[in-house]
Amino acid sequence: MATSASALLSPTTFSTAISHKNPNSISFHGLRPLRLGGSSSALPKLSTTGRKSSSAVVRAELSPSIVISLSTGLSLFLGRFVFFNFQRENVAKQGLPEQNGKTHFEAGDDRAKEYVSLLKSNDPIGFNIVDVLAWGSIGHIVAYYILATSSNGYDPSFFG
């Protein structure tokens, strides 16, 4: 508390004599390393003219990890809570594959028996590993479609 008000309000000076390399002194611009606190020639030049560029367009970039995570999560949610009963009813209507009016297992094919332990889960309605893989892959397909169409300049303008 012995500092004066003039010392608190004076501009801060930084020493550029530190030249040792530590992770905090290196930054990157693309793939080119920029030295912070080093020479100012490595930093990009900024123009300070007063003229505005009307051709500059600011666009938000989609983060691939966020898009893939959200799309996969939404797909799993829809598969579990929206389409699950519809899917199970259609599979039950279709039934097992038959040959000459008998199922393959009844016709003597011992390998056609359903592998039950793969389809067991602790989920209350029976959402199992096959469902997770199927709905997760649909979510990934949708995410990659979103990323591919947004990266090539396609703008669907859904809301305006």
From Swiss-Prot:
Gene3D superfamilies cross-referenced by the UniProt entry: Chlorophyll a-b binding protein like (1.10.286.40)
Keyword vocabulary terms for this entry: Chloroplast, Membrane, Photosynthesis, Photosystem I, Plastid, Transit peptide, Transmembrane, Transmembrane helix
Membrane-traversing stretches: 66-86, 129-149
A matching Pfam family: PSI_PSAK
PROSITE patterns: PHOTOSYSTEM_I_PSAGK
GO terms under biological process: photosynthesis; photosynthetic electron transport in photosystem I; photosynthetic NADP+ reduction; photosystem I stabilization; protein stabilization
Cellular compartment(s): Plastid, Chloroplast membrane
Entry-linked InterPro entries: PSI_PsaG, PSI_PsaG/PsaK, PSI_PsaG/PsaK_dom, PSI_PsaG/PsaK_pln
GO CC annotations on file: chloroplast; chloroplast envelope; chloroplast membrane; chloroplast photosystem I; chloroplast thylakoid; chloroplast thylakoid membrane; nucleus; thylakoid
Role of this protein: Not yet known.
The protein's name: Photosystem I reaction center subunit V, chloroplastic
UniProt lineage: Eukaryota, Viridiplantae, Streptophyta, Embryophyta, Tracheophyta
